[in-house]
Amino acid sequence: MDLDPMLISGKYWKIKLNRYETKARIGAYQHERLLPQRLRLNVSVYVEKGSAPVNELSEVFNYDRIIEAIEVVVQEGHIDLQETLLERTAERLLACPEVAAVQIGSEKPDAYS
């Protein structure tokens, strides 16, 4: 049972993109500045439900917009901290008028391998 307060209200849809992988120049250590590394993100975007059911891609918040927000931030250049990347990505998503809230997390699967 999902006790997510945003969902309990009945006002929002939760759009999830899990385990999205990209390459990013990210990390505070010197060796992390040399090459891009794998970055895995989990993003949930809460969008307000409309008053009528929809069945057209043009009428909903498309997953592609989540990927686009991530990739724009990644392409801006080296980022020292995952928290910075997450904040910038969340800010981009929250700039969309239909987005009420964002949950976002990341991992660098190869950082300690």
Where are these regions (language model features)?
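N-terminal, polar/charged subdomain of small-to-medium soluble alpha/beta proteins
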Residues: 1-113
